[in-house]
Each structure stands twice: as structure tokens, then as C-alpha cells.
Swiss-Prot record:
Protein's UniProt name: Methionine--tRNA ligase
Encoding gene per record: metG
Transmembrane segment boundaries: none
Source lineage: Archaea, Methanobacteriati, Methanobacteriota, Stenosarchaea group, Methanomicrobia
Species, as recorded: Methanococcoides burtonii (strain DSM 6242 / NBRC 107633 / OCM 468 / ACE-M)
Cofactor binding description: Binds 1 zinc ion per subunit.
Keyword field: Aminoacyl-tRNA synthetase, ATP-binding, Cytoplasm, Ligase, Metal-binding, Nucleotide-binding, Protein biosynthesis, RNA-binding, tRNA-binding, Zinc
Length: 684
């Protein structure tokens, strides 16, 4: 049964862009799908509001302002305007876009933190804080760097961003150093305030079991909550930020006031539209967060616990995207692994809708996306130009030349059935946050239209029976109308143009999906159509690849010095042929990793608990330690050989095998399903 439209109003939010640098393609992996989802809900008749805002507090902005000899206020003014403009250029149409430094957010944050204090969920504690004797200052968050205590990779003060991804509390970082002078730091004692996150374990376990959205968010969070939950330091020694109640020398941690921004932006929207923000955050509205996969911990653990403690509604769904990479390196604007939205894309003349389609259709939303200009070119040329654009142009041009209008004729029931089936399948995909499946489903209707046009050969029929030919092109016009409505969430500007080309006078953005089967009107004048999608030439792709390669090379040189190119690993010799009977003896299934820990006696082995749809999880030992951090594996779905005889490795029993390949550097590469599925699903 379809979830939308529902009587409950829906609030869609996005993880806040940090107002400390420009927008890159990695940002858009969150914002474009959220916009697609919102547009789609509107097309079902659902009441939906879409809000976001700039994250304007925290140490990176202060750090940047000091380097540029300006103020945090000036920094955020520049980048808030930048993101607002980029979103509009990319068709991300927000109902409100505020900042966390708005008075509304200051007031709402103070109210919520005060309520947590009043309810007994906040307490003071003396802890060790990094301090630089050379600069004579405390070093919160990005002011300090060092070694992650968990994975031993270089990390920032509040997170291991290039290693295991763990949130780090003050004082945890090993071998601390000041990021301002690069000198060694030391730890000093200071009083800060903590949120009693540990008291919310039972609540979080129950809450997460019922959390909607994508499985990677729920499973990752559950894996953490099932372990020991530690209380959370929610203050920092900074001047910039929202003051902690009663303490002018402290501000609340940015991960407290940033998500509270969702409430503040809803308030700002409500005030501007004479609406109620409480219908989402206090009453029975539904809240859906779209975020990047790197901030699941904050949105699925800290945030719902804070909301519960302060008496607010918790999110109904969290939709977490896979990270975007370039040449297998995670996007990072500070490190230089990026493709900028303006100078690398829009300024080169690429249309906004092409990138929207690429991001939606390339791979499952929860999987990592390794950005490729070549794949981008192939998606545009093969699908948008070769399939969809080809059907639109040949249909409309033929109709214009031979009829000048939509001719008389009956729209066949099988055409209407195909459209209805496509609508239902597309809506189901969208409700499950499967944007690739949605795009593929709609593109299949374009392929159906091409086949229908080609098989009926109207260019021949026009010479023999113009009336019969007219009926064929009218059916094609009906398919075109449906495609415009179904592709509008992904290709809003192009579909606005196509909508006009088929003679429609209504607003395609405000037209319900179900109007796709309302018959096109015979006699509607059709002007000569324009070509909606142009091929991307190889020379342009090569130019863009060269720009990206140069930037990555520069980033590597800056970060690690000169790096030799790895030799290509020789392909292993193929094994002897086996019979199908031999293969059928293998029971290979999809499993979800629910916990992972190192085996101390081994340099290569990890002990995993894997959900295979059985009553209990399966313990499996896997040689993944050198290539994967245990925390990064939690929530991942993998291929498992389940009927391998039990064996003991380093004294630990293993009841199966996780299947993986090996790259040129002998790192394990996990085999994962195209989209998330039920644990225990058989691989045939």
C-alpha cells in the first residue's frame, strides 16, 4: 500500500552545507535526491515542506577567518549566498534556507539546551582539553590534529575524517599538534558540560528498530548503540557560536545547534507563510532527513536522543547517501579531492539536469559513487540523448511535420496500462528512496515508446492511411505527456520545456502524476520541437578528465608528497571448468554485517557477526583487517558463502566466508549487492 499521499504533513530536510567553502558534486548527492523526493511527493498530492540552511558555527570557520584576517560573519555571508545560488542553479527548490546564526536558531537552541538541563540530562565534568603553549590557547576540534586512537590514522580533533570515521571526544586524540603553528600540543584540565547520552540506550534501540529511510543509516546506528554508549561533551571553549546557558566563556558544540537548525528553519518558513512549525516538531507531522553517510552517527543517535530529552518529535526516516569519491578518494574540499559545481560543471556549459540525472541514476543511493566524467558522458549520450531525447524529438517532429497538431484517434488501453504500471512502480521506488530504480523505471517507458513508434512505422503509414497514422502519433503524445510528468522531479527545467512542446498550458511542476493518463487533446497545436539533449563530445570529456586528474595529482602531492603510480596487478590464471552441479552446491547469500572487531593475535583477520536472516547472527572470520576499519563495515551488505564447513582461525570459530576480490595493492574489495535487500537473499 502506498505511503503517500498521507494526511500527515511531511517535512523534508537536508544535512546543512558548511559555510566555509564552495559547493562540490559530493554535496549534491544529498541535496538533489532530496529535491527529487520532494518534487515527487508533491506530484502525489502530498503536503510537503522542504527546508535547509547553512551550518555557520564550529572551529573551521573561525580558523578560516583568522587565516584570511576577516570575521566569521563575513565568511558565512559569502558562502551562504554561494550555496543559495548554487541550489537555485541546480534546481534544488527549498521552501526556506536559513543559517544557524539566525536569531531564530540562537533562541531555539537556548530553549532546547535549557530544557535538557532542566530535565536532568546535562552535567558538568572536568576533562582534558588540548592546549598549545606556543599560541597560548585552547585547541577545540579543528584547531588540533593528531592520531586517531581507534585506527591510528591522522585525524582532526572531533572526527577521524579520512580513517574510521569515528566521532572523537575532546582529549581522545593521540599525539596532539596545533594546526595553527604545527607545534606540539599538551592536555590541560577544564570544566565542560556533557549530555547523558548513555541514559537513552533503551530508547534508541527501540527507536532505531522502527526508523524508516535507508538501511545503512539504521543498521550503522544500531551497531553503535548496541555497544557501550558514552556521554557526549556538548560545549566548546570558543567565542564564536551560541552561548551555553549561564556560561559566557563556553558555546554549545556545533553538532548541537546545527540539527536544531532544522527546527529553526521550519519556524522561519512557518512565520513567512502563516503556517505552524509545531505540526512537524510537536504534533503528528512526519520528518524525513536526507544526509551524507558520514553523519549517520549524529542524526541517528545524538539528535533523536536530544529531541526525546527536550520533548520534541523524532525523525521518522533518515536517508543516508553513499560517499562520493574521485579516483577512489573520498571527496574533501579541505584536502582538494573535489569536482566543483560552479567552475568544473556549470561554468563549462553543462545543463543542471544532466548532473541531476547522473546522480540519481548512476548507482544505488546508499552505495559509494566514484565520480567519472566518462560515465557521465555515457549516461547522457546513451540514455538521455539516445533513448529519451530520441523518442521525444522524433515523435514531436513527425507530428509537427505531418499534422501540425495532436491528431484525432483513440489512445489504446494497453498504452494507458503501461503508463499506469510505470507510475505505480516509480512511486514505489521513490517511497523506498531508490532513485536509480525510479530513473530506470521511467527510462523504460521511453524505451517502450521508441519500440512502439518504430514497430508501427508511421513514416510508411502516413502514405497509406493518415488516419491510422494519426492514432499512432496520438498514442506517442500520450506517452510523451507521461514521461514529462514522471521525469519532472529529476529533470525539472528540461521537462518544463518538453511540456510546452507538446502544447500543455498548465504548470508541469504542479501537475499530479495521475494526470498522465488524462487524454491529450486532439487539435492541440504543436510547434516545431527543439532538441532537448545534445551529445557530449569525447573532446569535452577528455578536457574535464584532465582537469580532475590534475587537481587530484596536486592534492596527493600536497598531502603525501610525490606518489608513484601503482603497477597493474597481473590477472590471476583462470581455474579449471566446473559443472553446474558443482556450482549449485555453493549456498551464497547476502548478509548484513552487524558488528566487527579486530582479532588481536592476527594482522589480517577480523571477527564479524553477520545477519543472514537466521534466528541468530553468524560469526565469520574474514581477512579484511588490512583494508577495512571494523567500524566502516557495520551496516554493509556482503556476499557470504554460508555452507562452508566451520573452521578455527587464530582460535576463533568461523562459520562461513565473506567473498571479496583483491586490487593491485592486495587490498580486499568487498562484493556488494546493487541495492540493499533482505539478509539471507540467495545469490543464484
Amino acid at each position: 500500500m502506498s505511503k503517500f499521499p498521507s494526511e500527515k504533513p511531511v517535512l523534508v530536510t537536508c544535512g546543512l552545507p558548511y559555510a566555509n567553502g564552495k559547493a562540490h558534486v559530493g554535496h549534491l548527492r544529498t541535496y538533489v535526491p532530496a529535491d527529487i523526493f520532494t518534487r515527487s511527493l508533491k506530484k502525489t498530492g502530498q503536503e510537503v515542506t522542504f527546508v535547509c540552511g547553512s551550518d555557520t558555527h564550529g572551529t573551521p570557520i573561525v580558523f578560516n577567518a583568522e587565516e584570511l584576517k576577516t570575521t566569521p560573519t563575513e565568511i558565512i555571508k559569502v558562502y551562504h549566498k554561494h550555496f543559495d545560488e548554487i541550489f537555485k542553479k541546480m534546481g534544488v527548490m527549498l521552501d526556506a534556507f536559513g543559517t544557524t546564526d539566525d536569531p531564530t536558531n540562537h533562541n531555539r537552541t537556548t530553549e532546547i539546551v535549557s530544557k535538557l538541563i532542566e530535565n536532568g540530562y546535562v552535567y558538568p565534568k572536568t576533562i582534558e582539553i588540548a592546549y598549545c603553549p606556543s599560541c597560548d590557547r585552547s585547541l577545540p576540534d579543528r584547531y588540533v590534529k593528531g592520531t586517531c586512537p581507534h585506527c591510528k590514522k591522522e585525524a582532526r580533533g572531533d572526527e577521524c575524517d579520512q580513517g574510521c570515521g569515528k566521532h572523537l571526544e575532546p582529549g581522545e586524540l593521540e599525539h596532539p599538534a596545533c594546526t595553527t603553528c604545527n607545534g606540539p600540543a599538551e592536555y590541560k584540565q577544564q570544566e565542560h558540560f556533557f549530555f547523558k547520552l548513555s541514559q537513552f540506550k533503551d530508547f534508541l534501540l527501540e527507536y532505531l528498530e522502527g526508523l524508516g529511510g535507508t538501511l545503512n543509516a539504521r543498521n550503522y546506528a544500531l551497531g553503535w548503540v548496541k555497544q557501550e554508549l558514552t556521554d557526549w561533551c556538548i560545549t566548546r571553549s570558543l567565542d564564536w557560536g551560541i552561548k551555553f546557558p549561564g556560561h559566557e566563556d563556553l558555546v554549545v558544540y556545533v553538532w548541537v545547534d546545527a540539527p536544531i537548525g532544522y527546527i529553526a528553519f521550519t519556524e522561519e518558513w512557518a512565520e513567512a507563510n502563516n503556517e505552524s512549525w509545531e505540526k512537524f516538531w510537536k504534533d503528528d507531522g512526519s520528518i524525513i532527513h536526507f544526509i551524507g553517510g558520514d553523519i549517520i552517527y549524529h542524526h541517528c543517535i545524538f539528535w533523536p536522543a536530544m529531541l526525546k530529552g527536550a520533548g520534541y518529535n523524532q525523525p521518522d526516516a533518515v536517508v543516508a547517501s553513499g560517499m562520493v569519491k574521485i579516483e577512489d578518494r573520498t571527496f574533501s574540499k579541505s584536502r582538494g579531492y573535489v569536482v566543483w559545481v560552479d567552475e568544473d560543471y556549470l561554468d563549462h556549459g553543462f545543463h543542471q539536469d544532466l548532473l541531476r540525472y547522473y546522480l540519481a541514476s548512476y548507482t544505488s543511493h546508499t552505495k559509494e559513487l566514484n565520480f567519472s566524467w566518462k560515465v557521465f558522458q555515457d549516461k547522457v549520450n546513451t540514455e538521455l540523448v539516445g533513448v529519451f531525447g530520441n523518442f521525444l524529438y522524433r515523435t514531436l517532429l513527425f507530428t509537427h511535420k505531418n499534422f501540425g497538431e495532436i491528431p484525432e484517434g483513440e489512445v489504446k488501453q494497453d498504452i494507458l496500462d503501461e503508463i499506469n504500471t510505470t507510475i505505480e512502480n516509480a512511486k514505489e521506488a521513490m517511497e523506498n528512496y531508490e532513485f536509480k530504480k525510479y530513473a530506470d523505471t521511467v527510462m523504460a517507458l521511453a524505451s517502450y515508446g521508441n519500440t512502439y513508434f518504430q514497430s508501427n512505422e508511421p513514416w510508411k503509414l502516413i502514405k497509406e492511411n493518415k488516419e491510422a497514422c494519426g492514432e499512432i502519433v496520438k498514442n506517442c503524445a500520450q506517452i510523451t505527456k507521461a514521461l514529462c510528468l514522471l521525469f519532472e522531479p529529476i529533470l525539472p527545467e528540461k521537462m518544463e520545456e518538453a511540456w510546452k512542446q507538446i502544447g500543455m498550458e498548465t504548470d508541469v511542476h504542479e501537475t499530479n502524476y495521475m494526470e498522465a493518463t488524462e487524454l491529450v487533446k486532439s487539435g492541440t497545436t504543436l510547434e516545431k520541437p527543439s532538441i532537448l539533449f545534445e551529445k557530449i563530445e569525447d573532446e569535452k570529456t577528455e578536457e574535464m578528465e584532465a582537469i580532475s586528474a590534475a587537481r587530484v595529482k596536486e592534492a596527493i602531492a600536497k598531502e603525501n608528497g610525490t606518489e608513484e603510480v601503482e603497477e597493474v596487478k597481473e590477472i590471476e590464471e583462470m581455474k579449471d571448468l566446473i559443472t553446474f552441479d558443482d556450482f549449485s552446491k555453493l549456498d551464497i547469500r547476502i548478509g548484513t554485517i552487524v558488528s566487527a572487531e579486530a582479532i588481536k593475535k592476527s594482522k589480517k583477520l577480523l571477527k564479524l557477526q553477520v545477519d543472514l536472516g537466521e534466528e541468530e547472527t553468524r560469526q565469520i572470520v574474514a581477512g579484511l583487517k588490512e583494508s577495512h576499519e571494523p567500524e566502516q563495515l557495520i551496516g554493509k551488505q556482503v556476499a557470504v558463502l554460508t555452507n562452508l564447513a566451520p573452521a578455527k582461525l587464530c582460535g576463533v570459530e568461523s562459520n562461513g566466508m565473506v567473498l571479496a576480490g583483491v586490487d593491485a595493492a592486495d587490498n580486499a574489495i568487498l562484493l556488494q549487492p546493487e541495492k540493499e535487500t533482505n539478509p539471507g537473499t540467495c545469490i543464484h
